[in-house]
């Protein structure tokens, strides 16, 4: 305390104020956007039976790539390899989708059985040390970060709900949050130190999973890492709003530009409520990227000129692929055309973002 007092005396007023503000920021608990504080819905009926927990995945995270045999663009699916991949990861995706669905059901209906079931699923995987294998390839570490983002994002709704549903489940909550923290630390190791040419949407999704985990576990180090990864991503966006590493995906370049937006918009929204404004990073890179994507959806000609390929629009016809519009339009005052695109596709439900995205980002416009 004595040292702090001397510093305050010695420093000029403005610098001292900045230092003190920084100290307060560092000490403050990490929080989610306001929608995560929503109360649990009024109890409706009784919960059905709890489905069996998917077997905790504790094996090697070495999986077949669905693009196996493709060239460097990694843009052509290998149907046989994809079938193998889906079989290998079934327990993981069943866990992601199932746990998120249980949390959603509970938040809507208030049925204690759904809450107990969701927590039993997550604590079973936590106790087993699922997804923690040190034996992994690129596809395996990708599944680890996707699953962490899905599960921690869904759990966050329980953690911060004003109804305090976890108050009677302290032991299970501790097990689950400790597991998330271990996975978050591993994801940081998995995705740190990559050369710029290797940093693409995978790194952005890793950063989202770490941001979600940071808030759930109140880990400032994880929060800082996620913010730093966002800044790397923002500085990859060129003056026209393109991501050079996603242009490499040729016929899927537009789809992958769109796929890069959900994690980046979520990170920026979470950073904002914790006192870190990322909107102006690289002269408004996130906004340039979003506007470039929406223009491309309306007319893919610019992407075709950039890549020399007709764009595969299959994914872009799926409404939930635009779930990023919710956090984005909470950050920015979206123009009428973008708001209309959002309204036409709502409500958004994305298990990789923790479930009901529209429910937790209901305010239109931004500051």
Swiss-Prot record:
InterPro entries: Alginate_lyase, Alginate_lyase_dom, Chondroitin_lyas. GO terms for biological process: alginic acid biosynthetic process; alginic acid catabolic process. Keywords: Lyase, Periplasm, Signal. GO terms for cellular component: periplasmic space. Residues 1-27 form the signal peptide. Belongs to the polysaccharide lyase 5 family. This is Alginate lyase. It comes from Pseudomonas aeruginosa (strain ATCC 15692 / DSM 22644 / CIP 104116 / JCM 14847 / LMG 12228 / 1C / PRS 101 / PAO1). The gene is algL.
